[in-house]
Structures are given as structure tokens and as C-alpha cells.
């Protein structure tokens, strides 16, 4: 949503250069920051989540599973009602055109998609979130609010965190992995023990505010 407000306010230089002025969407032209009076983010990964580093194999599998599903459904008639927007990887058909059933199980395209940085999963990493934060500025006419969640309890001896009783059971392994993951830096990004508290998917500290913005 912060990117949405950024586009309304400042537009997109890439879209302006690549699109004729008469065909440019108002979303990318800028000058509409006053359309949004306030923005409330709930458990938003402002600075990314360490789950990708605590459970690398699990998250890699999740990426492959997501793009594989998009490759299958994106080449069926269902793509007309929900566009997976994976055409750049040749994984989905163009909506309102004949589905490319023969393009299902495009393993080469799936691998390229997973290894690229042009997808949501990359934006959720610490490095992807940092890249986004460098592009996004706060609009002076918009009030920003953040609501962060925590469903872990700290062990007084180790300082690590594990799931609390009220957490959804399927999130217990994720919460424990994030809460007990030992690290100091992740490729020059400083991480402290304050990152152990989480809600099962997102580090609580990351849901408070973007690192490069005041709180």
C-alpha cells in the first residue's frame, strides 16, 4: 500500500518513459497524493522477514510451489478471472486470449522466476524490503499508521522466542525458527535479538515502521 501511495504521489518514471502520454494510467502520472488521507498497515513487512533465512529450504520450496501453481492455473480459463501476471516469465497466458494449455509445467520459466528478483517473495526478504524502502517516500499529506503483532514468548534464560498458546498451530514451527535463529548480520544488514519476537510470519520489529522513516 505504501508503494500505491508513492505511485499516486510521484508516479513512475519507468512507466512514463515506456508509455505514450495519452495511454499513461493516472496511477503512474503522479500528482494525486491527496487522494489518500491515511494509510494503516497491519503486520506489514516494512523491513522484510527473517523467515527466508531461518527456513531457507522451506521458503525455496514455497516459491517453486507458488510459481508452479501460477503456471498451471495461468494457462487455463481461470486466468481470465484472476490474472497471475507471469507473462514476463512465459508462465501464464494473456487474459482474454486463448489459454496456452501446452505451456503448463514450464520448468525453465519457473526456475527463472524463482531466481529473479521480480516477484513478491523477493520483496519480503530483508534485501528486497530495503530496496523498496529506498524507492518509497512518505507523502506529506498522508497519515501513516502501523499495527504490529506478536504471538511469541521470550525464554528468560536463552532470550529466544517460541510460540504462545494462542498462536495458530500451523505457525508454531515458523515462529520457533524465527525466534531461535542466531544471527548478527545478514549480508551487511544488522540484525539484533529484538528481531526474535514475531507473529509466526513476520518479525514484530519489522511491522512497526520502515527503517529509513521516523517512528
Regions found by a protein language model. Give the residues of each.
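Conserved beta-strand->loop/alpha-helix structural units within folded catalytic cores of enzymes
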Residues: 1-4, 41-43
